């Protein structure tokens, strides 16, 4: 119905509205958070991206801007969206706490991590990484990506309280 559609849109814009501001500050912040996740959970990939001047993660921009709409077939996109949005309100395991407040970033990290070996071994420049990442569209298995994303959430959660300490903003994403 129209009212439910409207309020769903309002909720989505509260979550994603910063992605669409003219100065792109919201997207820059998202990419910075993703960069920090890469540094924490995929340090070899982080070092490689640093070496090829790819830490801006612009090759992930489209993923985050349109919430993976151009990366998967529609049925898979809907499953990914459902997982991303329901991760904020997971009640089964976490007594009402969310699994994760930024599941979309863990989905992006899951895609990167699943191709980390190939990227490190065969791609020599930022342009090659960009072309490779864009070539993944409609070639990825959504179930595998979601499983890996969830595992990454738990991996980050398990590091909280250990040395070296996890960045506070990353910590708050998985321990709400």
What are these regions (language model features)?
Residues 1-176:
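Helix-rich, well-folded core regions that mediate interactions or catalysis
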């Amino acid at each position: 119905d129209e009212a439910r559609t409207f309020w769903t849109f309002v909720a989505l814009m509260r979550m994603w509205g910063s992605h669409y501001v003219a100065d792109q500050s919201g997207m820059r912040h998202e990419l910075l958070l993703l960069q920090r996740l890469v540094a924490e959970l995929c340090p070899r990939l982080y070092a490689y991206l640093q070496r090829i001047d790819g830490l801006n993660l612009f090759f992930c921009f489209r993923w985050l801007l349109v919430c993976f709409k151009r990366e998967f077939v529609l049925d898979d996109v809907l499953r990914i969206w459902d997982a991303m949005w329901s991760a904020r309100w997971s009640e089964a395991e976490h007594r009402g706490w969310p699994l994760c407040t930024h599941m979309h970033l863990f989905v992006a990290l899951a895609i990167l991590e699943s191709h980390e070996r190939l990227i490190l071994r065969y791609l020599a420049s930022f342009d090659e990484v960009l072309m490779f990442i864009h070539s993944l569209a409609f070639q990825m298995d959504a179930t595998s990506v979601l499983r890996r994303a969830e595992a990454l959430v738990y991996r980050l959660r398990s590091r909280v309280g250990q040395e070296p300490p996890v960045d506070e903003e990353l910590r708050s994403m998985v321990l709400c």
